């Protein structure tokens, strides 16, 4: 457990010692805020809820989370520090979990910084805070799914750009599987069980 905590602290610290963390958080907050209040027509809708906030999370994660995961293992492989890491008295499980939890916690911090939007909704009306809280939990778990994909792809390449592009593509495909336009296309010729299987693989279906 101590080794897992050590990897977690090391990885989390590496985020905040570089501009990456701050750039990610600023872009995330700017995109989410813009999408919620402008594209989501927050004020025009006249409803005290955060539907227009959460609906854009899968699409924002498609680009931003691969930017976080692209360096998890690709950088270690490129610089050769992965050999040093593997010589330490820890298991592969400790290394993988430590890096994953650190990146997941980083996303958690970014989500916490969106709480002013939640406060704004409560100031403007009387929302169902239970649903909003559940939305945050769901978004965090969805982010974990994106992180799993990005981490896996980062582990098989030394090039961070390749890791980013491939992770973005895979996350995009998994998200698009739940879009009505795509599902309607498959309904034209595919059996129902296949359509349901494709739909169940999408992040949109479960969020």
What are these regions (language model features)?
Residues 92-93, 160:
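Alpha-helix N-cap/start motif
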Residues 99-100, 135, 167-168:
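Residue-level recognition of transmembrane alpha-helices
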Residues 30-36, 115-117, 170-180:
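Aromatic-anchored segments of alpha-helical transmembrane domains
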Residues 49, 68-86, 100:
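Transmembrane helix boundary and interhelical loop/hinge segments in multi-pass membrane proteins
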Residues 34-37, 44-50, 54-55, 60, ...:
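Secretory targeting signals
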Residues 42, 47, 156, 166-207:
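Terminal transmembrane helical anchor/hairpin motif
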Residues 1-64, 68-72:
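Hydrophobic alpha-helical transmembrane segments
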């Amino acid at each position: 457990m101590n080794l897992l905590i050590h990897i977690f602290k090391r990885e989390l610290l590496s985020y905040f010692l570089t501009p990456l963390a701050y750039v990610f958080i600023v872009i995330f907050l700017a995109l989410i805020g813009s999408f919620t209040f402008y594209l989501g027509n927050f004020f025009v809708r006249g409803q005290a809820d955060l539907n227009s906030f959460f609906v854009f999370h899968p699409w924002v994660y498609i680009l931003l989370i691969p930017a976080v995961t692209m360096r998890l293992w690709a950088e270690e492989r490129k610089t050769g520090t992965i050999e040093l890491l593997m010589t330490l008295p820890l298991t592969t499980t400790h290394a993988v979990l430590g890096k994953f939890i650190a990146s997941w916690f980083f996303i958690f911090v970014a989500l916490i910084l969106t709480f002013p939007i939640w406060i704004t909704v409560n100031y403007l009306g009387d929302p169902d805070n239970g649903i909003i809280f559940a939305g945050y939990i769901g978004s965090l778990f969805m982010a974990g799914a994106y992180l799993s994909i990005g981490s896996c792809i980062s582990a098989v390449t030394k090039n961070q750009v390749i890791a980013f592009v491939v992770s973005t593509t895979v996350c995009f495909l998994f998200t698009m599987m739940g879009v009505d336009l795509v599902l309607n296309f498959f309904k034209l010729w595919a059996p129902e069980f296949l359509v349901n299987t494709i739909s169940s693989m999408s992040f949109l279906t479960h969020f």
